[in-house]
């Protein structure tokens, strides 16, 4: 219960321990109230909280591959359209281009900050901005699906700076972004000395060190 959480948080702080929460806002569960409402009707006020597209010639809207293999699109018979999921089909991607999505995400973050948490570890935060129009990716020889190219999207820094203004800058927080596919130079934009986005990032290059 939330009472259990409050008691745990107070106990941690009494012992000089800080609590950093996992923040997953590139996508939600397909059981989240937003998605349940979004899929219910094309006219739902939550429809544009996610990416819904019609199929092309009886196939997916584009050739993007999911990080978990297969198409990044799943057909939903309720409205005869597909929704985007860069990961599992149980994890539909949020549409960060929609200001209402950003407002609700920031409101949720502020709520947790007011509870007294000490930071956020942000899951795949470098992927929240998709290419305008969701164009087909470049197919590699022999491939069926293409890399969606959603890392370091056109508005990712704009959205993180907005997050900083609306939430992060108002609290004493440690923030770390999971940024797969982000170069060292690009990482400086996410966690620069100007403090306009995140405290730090972690990358995955170290995994390949033994490969030479």
What are these regions (language model features)?
Residues 1-110, 114, 127-182:
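Acidic/aromatic-lined carbohydrate-recognition and catalytic surfaces
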Residues 179-212:
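Noncatalytic carbohydrate-binding groove/subsite architecture in carbohydrate-active enzymes
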Residues 120-122:
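Hydrophobic residues within beta-strands of alpha/beta enzymes
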Residues 124-129, 204-206:
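Short, small-residue-rich loop/turn micro-motifs
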């Amino acid at each position: 219960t939330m009472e259990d959480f409050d008691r745990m948080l107070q106990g941690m702080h009494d012992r000089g321990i800080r609590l950093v929460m996992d923040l997953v806002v590139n996508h939600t569960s397909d059981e989240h109230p937003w998605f349940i409402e979004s899929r219910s009707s094309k006219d739902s006020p939550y429809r544009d909280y996610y990416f819904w597209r019609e199929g092309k010639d009886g196939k997916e809207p584009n050739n993007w591959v999911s990080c978990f293999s297969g198409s990044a699109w799943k057909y939903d018979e309720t409205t005869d359209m597909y929704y985007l999921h860069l990961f599992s089909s149980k994890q539909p991607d949020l549409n960060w281009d929609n200001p209402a999505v950003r407002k609700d995400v920031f409101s949720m973050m502020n709520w947790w900050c007011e509870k007294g948490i000490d930071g956020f570890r942000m899951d795949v935060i470098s992927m929240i901005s998709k290419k305008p129009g969701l164009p087909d990716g470049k197919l590699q020889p022999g491939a069926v699906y293409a890399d969606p190219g959603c890392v370091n999207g056109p508005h990712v820094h704009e959205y993180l700076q907005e997050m900083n203004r609306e939430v992060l800058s108002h609290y004493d927080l440690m923030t770390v972004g999971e940024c797969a596919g982000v170069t060292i130079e690009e990482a400086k934009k996410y966690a620069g000395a100007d403090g306009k986005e995140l405290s730090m990032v972690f990358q995955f290059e170290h995994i390949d060190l033994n490969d030479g």
